[in-house]
Amino acid sequence: HIDSQNYYEDTVSFSLAFAQFNSQDICIYRSDWNRLEAFNLTTNQLLTERYIAAYKTEPPKHYLDYFHGALYVSPNNDYILDDGWIWHPVASPKVWSLSQWIKHNPFESEDGSSVQTLCYRENWNAVMCWLDDQHVAIWNIELWDQEEFDLKPEPKNRSGIHLLSLAK
């Protein structure tokens, strides 16, 4: 039974993707608005077992203030692309390493060293895809003013297709 709970779950596509890891079939799914799991379909085992304390007055360690969206696995099964958003609301697609998540750090999808925010934009649920193992295309990205944390004013703001590389 897969359930993403009921906190603004209608604002994003249901987070679900399949990948291959060590020649085994993996299901990646959202178990809460800000939490993803990886489940081995071959061995029937949860691969990302972890505990995150409840939010009280301060966010606990590994707390993620991020709504997971549609998931896209890279062609070589090395990365996961997540079309999620943060409060403002602002779209904030991210990528992270599947092998880092499963082999080394069950908190990788929250705040691991491989997590990269690709851009900020006004709208989420955008069309995006992997072009190859290291490059992502995202349609309709408005130009973003990082200092103002808002869209750049017209006429400078041109939407279009943006090609983004994972190379650091």
Predicted region positions:
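Short beta-strand elements that form the blades of beta-propeller/WD-repeat-like
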Residues: 1, 23-31, 36-37, 77-85, ...
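Structural motif
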Residues: 33-39, 88-96, 145-162
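Short loop/turn segments immediately following beta-strands, especially the blade-tip
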Residues: 44, 97-107
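Structural signature of eukaryotic scaffold interfaces centered on beta-propeller domains
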Residues: 7-23, 67-78, 121-133
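Long, mid-chain structured domain cores
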Residues: 1-55
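Loop/turn-rich, solvent-exposed surfaces of beta-rich toroidal or solenoidal domains
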Residues: 124-168
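Surface-exposed loop and turn segments in beta-propeller and other repeat-based domains
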Residues: 2-9, 50-66, 103-122
